[in-house]
Amino acid sequence: MLLGDWAAADEALTQAMDSEGLTDIEIIPCYHGWLAALRGDAGAAKSTLAALPKLRASEDPSDKALISVVEAFAAAARHHPESALRHARATLAHVGTLGISSDCPRWAWPLAARTAHDLGDTAAAGELLALLDDCPPGHLAPMLKAERDLIRARLAARDGDPGAATTLAAAVSGLRELSTPYHLAHGLLDHSTHLLRTGDDQAAHAAISEAGIIAQRLGCQPLVDRAETLQPTRSRTTPT
């Protein structure tokens, strides 16, 4: 999932679920439900979660964080941002035990930050940034450093900072080097939105195209849909 080979991840998880001796291990189908949610199949994610009674009843922080992060991405797939933010932050509530850079918090933080920004919830965005800023040196995964740079650049763009284009471009470069293809695609679309707003259509369309290619390769319908919402603006540069 981190490398962006979601087809291989799907195949490996499916084989594991069908393997003798692993059928009762609920963490495996839960990860499969997580992948379904990432791809936009909220129904499959919901069905998977409903079939995990032991995991849902567990008081283990790692189990609770896993359930919460799947619920967060499933809510995002259903276009329920308030619920997505709530569940993502529920995952982050276990940072003290699990560490901010463990799997679930490492994926939950970017979703929470993105959703808070999109909702205009500046208080939540500030609290999420503070969570990373307060981490001791060496505890923050490079991916999270890149995601923190992105949300700061998005906030600067929202506030009309004249240097926002530069900081957004730098943030995308950081994502390209340090994060996942999924998160890079979202960052490219963030950057393209700002570029379109400021009239740099050519650069925006290049970013949209790259994000769309990543989305198609991942089989990530929410990303495909997001890229396509920006497509009509291309008519402004289409030759007549």
Predicted regions and their residues:
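Helix-coil-helix junctions within alpha-helical repeat/solenoid scaffolds
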Residues: 1-239
